[in-house]
Regions:
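Histidine-centered, transition-metal-coordinating active-site segments
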Residues: 1-86, 100-106, 110-411
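Short alpha-helical catalytic segment bearing the HExxH-like zincin motif
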Residues: 87-92
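Short active-site segment of divalent metal-dependent hydrolases/proteases
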Residues: 93, 97-98
Length: 411
C-alpha cells in the first residue's frame, strides 16, 4: 500500500501528502468544511474565475512548506522530523477558523471574534480528539517554540500562506501581477540564529514579491466592486439579525438561525460551546440559500438587499481621498427613502461609508532580513537599491462610499 496520497493541483502540480497525522488532518471534517468556503469570498463578482476554495489554498501552502523544509535542511539547518511534521500540520490548519465570507461574518454574526482566534480554538479541540498529536503544531502556531523561523514560515512577512495565496489568487483571477516566483523565493530561504533570512541573490525576487502584494491588494482584495458587495452583505446580515431579534420569522439553516436569533458577543463566543458548534456548521451555502429565500421576504429592506446580492445589482461605489460631507450623505439618504418608500433609518442600510488603509511592509511586524556571503544581515529596506520601501511602508488611505443606485442608473 502506498505511504502517501497524491493530489493534482492546477497551480503547483502534484502535491504529496504522507499517510499518518498529515493525511488525517486533510481528511478531518473541520478541514473538509473549507472545501465549501471560497478563498476570495465575493471577489467572483469582479473576477468570475475566482471560485477556488480555502481548502485548495491550505493544500498549496502545505506543499510550499514541504518544499521549504527540504531546501532549508539541505543547507545544513537541522530540523527534527517531529518539527517538520508539526510545522506542516500548523500550515494545513492555519485557516481552519475562517467562516463563510470571513470578515463579513466576524463583524456581523460572530461577535467580533477573529478567524485567527477561532483557528486556535479549533486546533485545540482537534488536539484533544487526536490525543495531543498537535501539541507541537499549536506551540509553533502561537510562536511559543524556540525555533522562531518555524513560526515565521506559518505567519510572517514571507510565510507560506502569502506565497500560496498570491500565486493562487493570481492564477484564478487572471490578474498576472500576483504571479510571484514562489519556487525561487523558497530556494533562497535560509536560517540564521533561529530566524528566517534570504540569501542576497534572492533580493530581486523579494522586491517583486512586495510589489506584487501591493498590486494584488488594490486590484483584487480591495477592488471597489468587491468592497461594495461585501458592504452589501454586511448590511443584509445586519438587517436580518435586527429583524430576528425583533421576533420576525426568517428562513435560515439551523446554524445560521443560531447566530441570527442570539445576540452574541466575544465573551459568549469563548464561553458557550454552542457558538463554536454552530460556527463549524456554517459555510457559503448557508448564506447563499438564505439570500435566495430572503429575496421574497415582506421586509423591503431585507428583500431588496438580498435580491441585489443574488442578481449582482450591487451598490454604486465612489472611491475618494476624503470623507463624504454631511449634506451629501443627507441627499443620498433622502433619495433612497423616496425611491424605496422607506424611512431615513431604514435607508441607512443602503449607504455604507468606510475608509481602508493599507501599507504593504511594516518593519515592526516582521522585517525581511537579507544575508550576505560574509554572514552579515541587513533589512530589505536598507539592502534594496531598487525598491522604494519608504513608499511601500507609507499608509495609503482611501474612502469608499457605497450606496443604492438610482432607478435610472445602469451598471
Amino acid at each position: 500500500m502506498s505511504d502517501r496520497k497524491i493530489i493534482n493541483d492546477p497551480v503547483f502540480g502534484f502535491i504529496n501528502i504522507p499517510k499518518g497525522l498529515l493525511y488525517d488532518i486533510v481528511c478531518h471534517p473541520l478541514l473538509q468544511r473549507l472545501t465549501r468556503i471560497k478563498q476570495l469570498g465575493l471577489s467572483s463578482a469582479v473576477y468570475p474565475g475566482a471560485q477556488h476554495t480555502r481548502f485548495q489554498h491550505s493544500l498549496g501552502a502545505f506543499h510550499l512548506m514541504s518544499e521549504t523544509i527540504k531546501h532549508i535542511t539541505a543547507k545544513g539547518n537541522f530540523i527534527f522530523d517531529s518539527e517538520a511534521e508539526a510545522v506542516q500540520a500548523a500550515i494545513l490548519l492555519h485557516d481552519i477558523g475562517h467562516g463563510p465570507f470571513s470578515h463579513v461574518l466576524e463583524n456581523t454574526l460572530a461577535g467580533g471574534v477573529s478567524h485567527e482566534e477561532i483557528s486556535l480554538m479549533l486546533m485545540e479541540r482537534m488536539n484533544k480528539d487526536m490525543k495531543g498529536q498537535l501539541n507541537l503544531a499549536i506551540q509553533i502556531f502561537k510562536d511559543e517554540y524556540p525555533k522562531k523561523f518555524l513560526h515565521q514560515l506559518v505567519s510572517g512577512q514571507l510565510d507560506m500562506d502569502r506565497l500560496d495565496y498570491l500565486r493562487r489568487d493570481s492564477f484564478y483571477t487572471g490578474v498576472s501581477e500576483g504571479n510571484i516566483g514562489s519556487a525561487r523565493i523558497i530556494k533562497m530561504l535560509d536560517v540564521k540564529d533561529d530566524h528566517l533570512v534570504v540569501e542576497s541573490k534572492g533580493i530581486y525576487s523579494i522586491e517583486n514579491f512586495l510589489m506584487s502584494r501591493r498590486l494584488m491588494y488594490w486590484q483584487v482584495y480591495l477592488h471597489k466592486t468587491s468592497v461594495a458587495s461585501e458592504k452589501m452583505l454586511v448590511n443584509t446580515l445586519t438587517r436580518a439579525k435586527e429583524l430576528a431579534l425583533r421576533g420576525v420569522e426568517l428562513f435560515a439553516s439551523p446554524a445560521l438561525r443560531f447566530f441570527l436569533y442570539h445576540p452574541i458577543d466575544k465573551k459568549e463566543f469563548y464561553n458557550s460551546p454552542d457558538c463554536l458548534e454552530n460556527f463549524i456548521q456554517l459555510d457559503d451555502n448557508d448564506i447563499w440559500t438564505a439570500l435566495k429565500v430572503w429575496s421574497n421576504h415582506s421586509d423591503v429592506v431585507l428583500s431588496t438587499l438580498s435580491r441585489g446580492m443574488i442578481n449582482r445589482k450591487l451598490f454604486k461605489v465612489e472611491v475618494t481621498s476624503s470623507s463624504i460631507t454631511k449634506a451629501r450623505k443627507e441627499e443620498i439618504l433622502s433619495r433612497i427613502s423616496k425611491q424605496l418608500n422607506i424611512n431615513k433609518k431604514e435607508a441607512e442600510y443602503f449607504l455604507s461609508i468606510s475608509s481602508i488603509e493599507n501599507n504593504m511592509y511594516k518593519k515592526e511586524d516582521d522585517s525581511i532580513e537579507i544575508i550576505y556571503k560574509d554572514g552579515s544581515t541587513r533589512d530589505i529596506a536598507k539592502a534594496s537599491d531598487m525598491l522604494n520601501i519608504s513608499l511601500l511602508s507609507r499608509k495609503v488611505k482611501k474612502y469608499y462610499i457605497c450606496y443604492l443606485r438610482s432607478e435610472n442608473d445602469g451598471h
